[in-house]
Amino acid sequence: MATDVFSSKNLAVQAQKKILGKMASSKYIATSLIDDTSGEVLDELYQLTREYTQSKKESEKVIKNLIKTVIKLAVLYRNNQFNEEEIALMEKFKRKVHQLAMTVVSFYQVEYTFDRNVLSKLLNECRELLHQVIQRHLTAKSHGRVNNVFDHFSNCEFLAALYNPFGPFKQHLQRLCEGVNKMLDEDNI
């Protein structure tokens, strides 16, 4: 995003992205920027990821990358940094995330409907749309963060373990779906 023209607004947006990206590393600051329901869902995703990976470091990295990405996306959106094409892609991304959330909850609520390939495909469609939205705004490092998050959550083995009705993650899935359902009810997703 290098240009020869100085722009205070662009400089301010870059500073916001940088500061909020650093702040997202602190759980206290991140929770102050995220509503209670979203925080509960993120906490559940962290616990689930930690138990699945058996790695505190890896699970913290995935959730931190998710939070940083969401915050940077919000900064760009609130500062009107997207052109018309990107706004259209952002709307498409929001609809796809909403569809994903409804599918996650539906697969939990209706027995024997879970299909890991469907969820993985939806997650990867979200990833591609997000990459298109942020293409000209965020660095390769930020794109790597997006891939880290989606690589983890779209992994078919992870999804199969999560939805296994006899597996160790049943309670996590229940709490996760309750939170996602609440976010859907509140129009937060």
Curated annotation (Swiss-Prot):
Any Gene Ontology biological process: apoptotic process
Matching InterPro entries: TNFAIP8-like (IPR008477), TNFAIP8_sf (IPR038355)
Family: Belongs to the TNFAIP8 family.
Organism, as annotated: Xenopus tropicalis
Protein role: Acts as a negative mediator of apoptosis.
Alphabetically ordered keywords of this record: Apoptosis, Cytoplasm
Protein name: Tumor necrosis factor alpha-induced protein 8
UniProt-recorded Gene Ontology molecular function terms: cysteine-type endopeptidase inhibitor activity involved in apoptotic process
Primary gene name: tnfaip8
PANTHER family according to UniProt: TUMOR NECROSIS FACTOR ALPHA-INDUCED PROTEIN 8, TUMOR NECROSIS FACTOR INDUCED PROTEIN
Subcellular location: Cytoplasm
GO CC annotation: cytoplasm
